[in-house]
Each structure stands twice: as C-alpha cells, then as structure tokens.
C-alpha cells in the first residue's frame, strides 16, 4: 500500500515533536514558557484535549493509549495547519488523518487519533474567524474625513502666511494724510481672583466686589464666546462645508439638465406640401361645391400668323345661358 501524500514532512514533524517535548521536560521551569510559546504559534489545543478527556475518561477506559492518541491528533492537526498556513482546513484534516494512520497501527488508536483531528477542526475555524475580525477595515466615511483633514491643513498653512491688520487713513488739518496700521490684539478673559483663605480677615465689601467682578468677567466671556462661536465653527468645519457645497452644486446641475430635457419643445418641422394639395384642403375646409365637367365652356381661337395676341373672348353669364 502506497504511503499517503505528504507523509515525509508528517514523519519529520512526528519525529521533531518528541524532541521538542524532551527539551522542554529537561528545561524544567522554562519548559512551561516554551510550551506557551508553541501554543501561541501552533494554536491552543486545550479545548480539544478536554474534549478527548470527556470522550475517553480514565474510569471507563483504563488504558491511556487511546486518550493520548486523541490528544496527539489535536496536536497533529495544529502542526498540519501551521505548515499549510491554514489555507484549507478540510485538506488539513485529511493530512492529519493520514498522519494518524501512519503513526498508529491499531484500529482503536487510529480512531482516537482521527477523533482528535475532528475535534480540533471547529476550534481552528473559530480562531480563523477571530483573526479575520481583527483585520483593519476601511470605514465608509474615511474619504470624507481624509478630505476634511487635507482641507484643514491647507487652511492652516494659508493662515500662517496671511497676516491680517487694521489700517486707518486720517487727514490732518494741514492736509497731510496719516496712516495708522496695527495688528489684531488677542484679548484674554480676565482671571478670577482667588478668595482669601482666611475668612475672618475678609470683609463684606471685598466679597461683594469679587462677586461683581467675577459676574462681569463671566458675562464678557459669554459675549465674546457668542460672537466668535459662529466664526470658530466655520473655521473648524470648513472641510465639511466645502464638501457639501460641491455635492449640492453637482446635484443642482444634474437637476437642471434633467428638467431642461424633460420640458424642451419638440423641434418638429412639418414637410412642405404641394400647392395642389393645399387647394384641395382649402376646398374641403370651405365646403365648396365643384362644377361638373358638363357645365364648362371651352373657347378656342384659331392660330394667326402674326405674333400679337388676339382679342379676349366675350364674357358669358353662365346663369342666363342654357346649354
């Protein structure tokens, strides 16, 4: 019988695992830290080991070989998953079962090892879902926040180069023009004076003065805050305002285009008709009676040699004529 595919690296892992366990056993205390390091790399198999202990309890199965085979199947599945990089868990399970078949010759131990591979599969799937949930994802509003941050940086850099100042032009009595130019001054809210700690030395007049001073300072601060609140809000949210303005402009342009196309007059030019058809339509509209062919009188004149035209025929009143 041919060996399953991938049996060489499985044998290498099976041979390497006892060596690692022996090294950790000889190390004593540091072996626990090494085992934890391997668990973090290969994956935690404690849940699978508990499932094996519930399946093969020692009071029901006095032999420990089947329990160890089941726990070894859990570890083999973790090793196969580490080698395959967890791409396909079904393939990892098949490789784990083939490794169990090569490692154990008895059917009971093979079944226990296969059961360990099967028990580790749902825990591996859960770990993959947890790793996928930890991956960073882009939020839908990330482009808008990026535009806002870029716009705020541009505005900050522009404000650093632009210096605002007040300029006044006054004309003196002698006719000279005097120019006063000053930079804006920053007004800070006056700090509240701290009340003295010794209440015995403080007087009522000083307390009333401090209260009046604090109320006046608070009122001035609120007035300054109300005046500067709108401008500060505009400066902080300038990126959002620009973005909304662009979006609304595009929507208005689209609406104007659609409304123009929907309400436009159809440019239809009727084809010109011949005059004979126009005469027939005029006759039909006026409801005129047509003369029969028998009531028409045809007058013919003989052709003469000279070029001058002959006299016109006499007018005949058809109403007084009888044919």
UniProtKB/Swiss-Prot annotation:
A Pfam family of this chain: BSMAP
PTM notes: N-glycosylated.
Xref: InterPro entries: Uncharacterised_TMEM59
Extracellular topology ranges: 36-238
Residue ranges of the motif ATG16L1-binding motif: 263-281
Signal peptide positions on this chain: 1-35
GO CC terms of this entry: Golgi membrane; late endosome; late endosome membrane; lysosomal membrane; lysosome; plasma membrane
Principal subcellular localization: membrane
Subcellular location: Late endosome membrane; Lysosome membrane; Cell membrane; Golgi apparatus membrane
Membrane spanning residue stretches: 239-259
Protein family: Belongs to the TMEM59 family.
Subunit description: Interacts with ATG16L1 (via WD repeats).
UniProt remark on domains: The ATG16L1-binding motif mediates interaction with ATG16L1 and promotes autophagy.
Role summary: Acts as a regulator of autophagy in response to S.aureus infection by promoting activation of LC3 (MAP1LC3A, MAP1LC3B or MAP1LC3C). Acts by interacting with ATG16L1, leading to promote a functional complex between LC3 and ATG16L1 and promoting LC3 lipidation and subsequent activation of autophagy. Modulates the O-glycosylation and complex N-glycosylation steps occurring during the Golgi maturation of several proteins such as APP, BACE1, SEAP or PRNP. Inhibits APP transport to the cell surface and further shedding.
Identification of the protein by name: Transmembrane protein 59
Organism: Sus scrofa (Pig)
């Amino acid at each position: 019988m041919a060996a399953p595919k991938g049996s060489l690296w499985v044998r290498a892992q099976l041979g390497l695992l006892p060596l690692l366990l022996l090294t950790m056993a000889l190390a004593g205390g540091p072996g626990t830290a090494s085992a934890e390091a391997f668990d973090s790399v290969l994956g935690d198999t404690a849940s699978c080991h508990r499932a094996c202990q519930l399946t093969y309890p020692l009071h029901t199965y006095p032999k420990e070989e089947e329990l160890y085979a089941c726990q070894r199947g859990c570890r083999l599945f973790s090793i196969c998953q580490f080698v395959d990089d967890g791409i396909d868990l079904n393939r990892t399970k098949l490789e784990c079962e083939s490794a169990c078949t090569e490692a154990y010759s008895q059917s009971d131990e093979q079944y226990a090892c296969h059961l360990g591979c099967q028990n580790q599969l749902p825990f591996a799937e859960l770990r993959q879902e947890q790793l996928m949930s930890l991956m960073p994802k882009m939020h839908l509003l990330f482009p808008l926040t990026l535009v806002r941050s870029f716009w705020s940086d541009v505005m900050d850099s522009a404000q650093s180069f632009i210096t605002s100042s007040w300029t006044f032009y006054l004309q003196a009595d002698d006719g000279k023009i005097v120019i006063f130019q000053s930079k804006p001054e920053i007004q800070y809210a006056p700090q509240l004076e701290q009340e003295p700690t010794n209440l015995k030395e403080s007087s009522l007049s000083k307390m009333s003065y401090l209260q009046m001073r604090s109320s006046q300072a608070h009122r001035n601060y609120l007035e300054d805050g109300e005046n500067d609140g709108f401008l500060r809000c505009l400066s902080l949210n300038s990126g959002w305002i620009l973005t909304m303005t662009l979006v609304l402009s595009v929507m208005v342009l689209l609406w104007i285009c659609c409304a123009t196309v929907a309400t436009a007059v159809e440019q239809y030019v009727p084809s010109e008709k011949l005059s004979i058809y126009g005469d027939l339509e005029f006759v039909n509209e006026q409801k005129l009676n047509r003369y029969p062919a028998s009531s028409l009188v045809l007058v013919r004149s003989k052709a003469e040699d000279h070029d001058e035209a002959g006299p016109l025929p006499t007018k005949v009143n058809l109403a007084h004529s009888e044919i």
